[in-house]
Amino acid sequence: MKRTTDPTLPAAETSAPGYPEGDRRRVPEGLTLVPTKIFFTKGVGSHRDELRSFELALKDAGIERLNLVHVSSIFPPLCKIISREEGSKLIAPGSIAFCVMARQASNEMRRLIASSIGCALPADKNTYGYLSEHHAYGQTDEVAGDFAEDMAASMLASTLGVEFDENANWDEKEQVFKISGEIVRTFNVTQSHVIANKGWTTVVAAGVFIF
């Protein structure tokens, strides 16, 4: 597909293929991997072998048939959040899928393990947001989820220049972020599990990008 040069941009900047003129998802020449959609999922798996427990956790999350590539934590501008069911229909088995993933595993009986992805979205959809990965021992869904959500929101707030107390608890910071008007939404996707059987248990939480 031919690229269209925008005269308002530096010569090295072009419209990424597939994006309409004026779209903010512009990238330097040759760098066109900007996701347009994302779906969130989570899962848990248990097996005598750690690797198999991980595979079963991916299966529970519905992403075991993908070649997953872990990336860092930026939520792209204008990226649309879709359901796990819709996302699964858009990715073919064996395809390479980029994701932000949190993973925790243990073989200790009665151990509580958790993995969580936090998300913070700016009010301006043309600005990028943040995703955070958190994995822990001894934390419930609520505790792990709040921690991940706090991290994502704090990173976004820092980028946007919103002043806040790093030592405040999540509820206090959440109010500051909402009042600022810069952060429109925060949420988390979390999987926790208490190990009840011998062998390994793995929990995963992930945000999977689609192009």
PLM regions: where:
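Helix-coil modules at protein/domain termini and other flexible surface or pore-lining loops
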Residues: 2-211
